[in-house]
Amino acid sequence: MSGCGLFLRTTAAARACRGLVVSTANRRLLRTSPPVRAFAKELFLGKIKKKEVFPFPEVSQDELNEINQFLGPVEKFFTEEVDSRKIDQEGKIPDETLEKLKSLGLFGLQVPEEYGGLGFSNTMYSRLGEIISMDGSITVTLAAHQAIGLKGIILAGTEEQKAKYLPKLASGEHIAAFCLTEPASGSDAASIRSRATLSEDKKHYILNGSKVWITNGGLANIFTVFAKTEVVDSDGSVKDKITAFIVERDFGGVTNGKPEDKLGIRGSNTCEVHFENTKIPVENILGEVGDGFKVAMNILNSGRFSMGSVVAGLLKRLIEMTAEYACTRKQFNKRLSEFGLIQEKFALMAQKAYVMESMTYLTAGMLDQPGFPDCSIEAAMVKVFSSEAAWQCVSEALQILGGLGYTRDYPYERILRDTRILLIFEGTNEILRMYIALTGLQHAGRILTTRIHELKQAKVSTVMDTVGRRLRDSLGRTVDLGLTGNHGVVHPSLADSANKFEENTYCFGRTVETLLLRFGKTIMEEQLVLKRVANILINLYGMTAVLSRASRSIRIGLRNHDHEVLLANTFCVEAYLQNLFSLSQLDKYAPENLDEQIKKVSQQILEKRAYICAHPLDRTC
C-alpha cells in the first residue's frame, strides 16, 4: 500500500500531512450497561479497531424470522390503512390510527419484555424503522414517545419507576414526551430556566417553567422534564444544576398550548408545555439530583442512530417510485432513464441509502453487543449523514419528477417538507458536528498529552522522531493497518478502497496531532476547523461501514453483492477525495483554507445586519 506517499502526490494533500512540528508556541433486552469500548474515537489516533467493525454484525436466524413475521402486519397496516395525505392536510393523526398503532405494539418496541414491551434489540428496532418511515408524522410521534420520551426511565430509572410507568407506556395507554427545549434555550440546553424547588418537608419538588417545541406535548400523560435545582457541592457551596424528573399530567399545574402549524410532519403534535407549581414527589427524580444534563445527553445519544434506517427505508421507496417514472417518461424521443444526468441522480440516491443503511446497522450491531461500546459519536454521525442525505436525495427525486413532484396530488412535496426537520431534530447538525469533533479530539488529547507537551518544549528525541516521520511520509510511507492481505478482513475486490481508507485514517491521525499542538484547548472555539474534522470522521465511518458490509455480502453470497461492491467502491473513492481536500483545508496556510475570508465577510454583513454590496445598477455620478 502506498500510504501517505500516494497522499503526498498532490500539493494540497502534501500540506495536509505536513510534519507535526508547526511551532514550539440472550434475552433481547435493551442493554443499559456502562460503555467499555469505542471505535470512532480511535480513528482520531490514526488507528482502526478491526474487531469492533469486522465482520459486519449479523442477527440469528431466529431473530430474523421473528422480526420478519412482525413486519408483515405493520407494513400491511401502513400500506392499506394509513392515509398520509389526510394526516398532513388535517394536521392530526386520527384516533383510530393511534389505537391501531398501540394494538400492533408499536409504542413499546424497546421496552423490556418484563415491563410489557417487545424488548427489541437496536437492530430489530432499526429494521422496523424502515417500515414506520412510510408516514413522517407517525414516525416522529412514535420516536418522541420511545426514543426520547420514555428512554430516560429505561436508562436511568429505578426498578420502582420502571415497574410503575413502563407497562402503560409500552401499551400506549400512556404517551410520553421529552421536555428540554425552552423559549430562551435551544441547542444550549445548560441555559434552561425552568426551576424545581424542594418543598419544606423535603417530600416534593415544586416545578415552574415552560417548554417549547415539545412533540406529543398535547397528547402525553408522562413527561421527562429537565429543570434547575439547588445542589450542595462537596465544598458546601450551593449551585444550580439540572435535574431530570418524571412528571405526570395528573400531578396538576400541567397545561399545553395549541399545536404548532408546521412546515412538515404536520400530523405530529408539537406544542408548548407549561408547568405551574407542579408538585413532583422526590421519588420521581430520574437519576441523581444535579445529573440531569448527563441524563438528557444519554437519552439523545442513545436514539440518534435509528434515523439512518428510517431515512434508508424512505429513500428505497422513493427510488422505486421515481425509477418507474424515469423508465416510462419520454423526452426528446428518449426515456428519462437514458440521460446521464438522470442516471447520476439515481446513483446518488442508491449510494446514500446504502451508506446510511450500512452505518445504521453497524452501529446497532455494536450497541447490541454485551458490554456495548460507547457509540455516541457513531450515532451522531449516522444522524448527520442520513438527515443531510435525505434532504439532498428527496430534492433530486423532485427534480426527476419535474412538475409532478411539486404538486399536492402526489406525495413527493410532502416528503420534502417532512424531511427538512431531520437536520434540526435531536440536536442540530451544526451542534452534532461540534460534538463529534470535540469528543474525539478530547480522547486523542488525553492520550497525546505527553507527546504534545514534549513537542512544545522542543524535546530533542520527540522532535527528531517527528522529523523522521515527516521524512518517511514524504518518501512514500507504507500504511498497513491490517485490512487487506493474507490476514485481512476486507474482500480483495474492495482492496483499493480499503487502502484509501487506511491512508485517510493514518493522515487524519497525524492531522489531529497537528491541530492539538497548534490550538490546544482553544480548538473549542474553532468551529470551521471542527466542522472539517467531523466531516472527515463521518466519511471514515461511512467507508468503514460499507467495506465491512460489502465484504460480508460477498463472503456469504448475498444476491446482487456485485452491486454492493460497486456502491461501496464508488463511495470510498468520493469520500477519499473529499477527505484529501478537507485535510488540506486544515492547514492554516493552505490556499484552500478560506477561514479568515469567511469570518471577515460574515462580520461585515452582521455589523450592518444586511447585504452590504451596492446594487449593480448604482452609479457614483
From Swiss-Prot:
Ubiquitously expressed in most normal human tissues and cancer cell lines with high level of expression in heart, skeletal muscles, brain, kidney and liver. In the cerebellum uniquely expressed in the granular layer (at protein level). Keywords: Acetylation, Disease variant, FAD, Flavoprotein, Membrane, Mitochondrion, Mitochondrion inner membrane, Oxidoreductase, Phosphoprotein, Primary mitochondrial disease, Transit peptide. The active site is at residue 426. The modification Phosphothreonine is found at residue 478. It comes from Homo sapiens. Changing residue 193 to W: In MC1DN20; uncertain significance. Belongs to the acyl-CoA dehydrogenase family. It comes from the Eukaryota. GO terms for biological process: long-chain fatty acid metabolic process; medium-chain fatty acid metabolic process; mitochondrial respiratory chain complex I assembly. It catalyses: eicosanoyl-CoA + oxidized [electron-transfer flavoprotein] + H(+) = (2E)-eicosenoyl-CoA + reduced [electron-transfer flavoprotein]; octadecanoyl-CoA + oxidized [electron-transfer flavoprotein] + H(+) = (2E)-octadecenoyl-CoA + reduced [electron-transfer flavoprotein]; oxidized [electron-transfer flavoprotein] + hexadecanoyl-CoA + H(+) = (2E)-hexadecenoyl-CoA + reduced [electron-transfer flavoprotein]; decanoyl-CoA + oxidized [electron-transfer flavoprotein] + H(+) = (2E)-decenoyl-CoA + reduced [electron-transfer flavoprotein]. This is Complex I assembly factor ACAD9, mitochondrial. Residues 1-37 form a transit peptide. As part of the MCIA complex, primarily participates in the assembly of the mitochondrial complex I and therefore plays a role in oxidative phosphorylation. This moonlighting protein also has a dehydrogenase activity toward a broad range of substrates with greater specificity for long-chain unsaturated acyl-CoAs. However, in vivo, it does not seem to play a primary role in fatty acid oxidation. In addition, the function in complex I assembly is independent of the dehydrogenase activity of the protein. Changing residue 426 to Q: Loss of long-chain-acyl-CoA dehydrogenase activity. Does not affect mitochondrial complex I assembly. Signal peptide: none annotated. It is a peripheral membrane protein. Pfam families: ACAD9-ACADV_C (PF21343), Acyl-CoA_dh_1 (PF00441), Acyl-CoA_dh_M (PF02770), Acyl-CoA_dh_N (PF02771). Its EC number is 1.3.8.-.
